[in-house]
């Protein structure tokens, strides 16, 4: 899809406005599909990055009767205050549904070591590939060691993310194990992206305004400053059912 120069320069948070407008103008009724895991399996490890992205994914998987566990491993999220808010929001929603939640290590220094030399790469570039690789490697390893034949991630539900990039990293991580496969389901189809916003408003989730890493935060704030907007204030913005 062709992107204008303006779209190429804008940080990911601004895409939220476009998504909300699309959802508001859409007359397509939401129909939740019946999900089936690959190869007839019924046990799944779901890598989750945050509550807004995982809300619809969790409800869809739960409605399909699939036995799943959430795996939260996101050392890319900085600063610590932001990381803790996103994690606690995810835990809150998991507890509401009675879904097991694995709180993996906040391997922050390892992430920075792997990101060295990529500090100025754009989003959707090689730094993001490294970031997906790192998180999915851990998810695949946990799946292998704990009897999960399938793993997937909610990252792909965001229209700002490159789904092919995410799926490539997921399959690459799973290829290391004979007993694990990556499920590259398109969470956006069937109204998934619209439902993601609806659930976020219903649950009043914390609304993060950048992807997660300090470089994304830096670039988003640079764009905001250049366009006369206030810098991001960590922990301030939450979804509202009235908006």
UniProtKB/Swiss-Prot annotation:
Disulfide bonds join 211-213. Transmembrane segments: none annotated. One of its GO terms (molecular function) is epoxyqueuosine reductase activity. Residues 1-30 are annotated as: Disordered. It is an enzyme of class 1 (oxidoreductase). Keywords: 4Fe-4S, Disulfide bond, Iron, Iron-sulfur, Metal-binding, Oxidoreductase, Queuosine biosynthesis, Redox-active center, tRNA processing. Residues 1-16 have a biased composition (Basic and acidic residues). InterPro entries: QueH. It catalyses: epoxyqueuosine(34) in tRNA + AH2 = queuosine(34) in tRNA + A + H2O. [4Fe-4S] cluster binds at residues 49-50, 128, 131. Pathway: tRNA modification; tRNA-queuosine biosynthesis. It comes from the Bacteria. It holds the Pfam family QueH. The keyword Disulfide bond applies. Catalyzes the conversion of epoxyqueuosine (oQ) to queuosine (Q), which is a hypermodified base found in the wobble positions of tRNA(Asp), tRNA(Asn), tRNA(His) and tRNA(Tyr). Belongs to the QueH family. PANTHER family: EPOXYQUEUOSINE REDUCTASE QUEH. This is Epoxyqueuosine reductase QueH. It comes from Histophilus somni (strain 129Pt) (Haemophilus somnus).
């Amino acid at each position: 899809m062709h992107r204008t120069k303006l779209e190429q320069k804008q940080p990911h948070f601004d895409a939220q406005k476009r998504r909300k407008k699309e959802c508001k103008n859409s007359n397509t009724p939401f129909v939740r599909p019946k999900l089936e895991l690959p190869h007839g399996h019924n046990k799944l490890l779901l890598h989750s990055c945050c509550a807004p992205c995982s809300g619809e994914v969790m409800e869809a998987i739960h409605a399909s009767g699939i036995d799943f566990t959430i795996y939260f491993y996101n050392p890319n999220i900085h600063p610590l205050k932001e990381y803790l808010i996103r994690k606690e929001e995810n835990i809150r929603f998991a507890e509401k549904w009675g879904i097991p939640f694995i709180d993996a290590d906040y391997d922050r220094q390892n992430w920075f070591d792997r990101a060295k030399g990529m500090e100025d790469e754009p989003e959707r570039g090689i730094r993001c590939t490294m970031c997906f690789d790192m998180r999915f490697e851990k998810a695949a390893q946990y799946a292998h060691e704990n009897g999960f034949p399938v793993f997937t991630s909610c990252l792909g539900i965001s229209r700002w993310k490159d789904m092919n990039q995410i799926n490539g990293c997921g399959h690459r991580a799973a290829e290391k194990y004979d007993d694990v496969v990556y499920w590259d389901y398109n969470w956006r189809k069937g109204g998934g992206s619209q439902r993601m916003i609806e659930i976020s408003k219903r649950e009043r989730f914390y609304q993060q305004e950048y992807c997660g890493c300090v470089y994304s935060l830096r670039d988003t704030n640079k764009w905001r400053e250049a366009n006369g907007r206030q810098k991001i204030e960590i922990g301030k913005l939450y979804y509202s059912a009235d908006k």
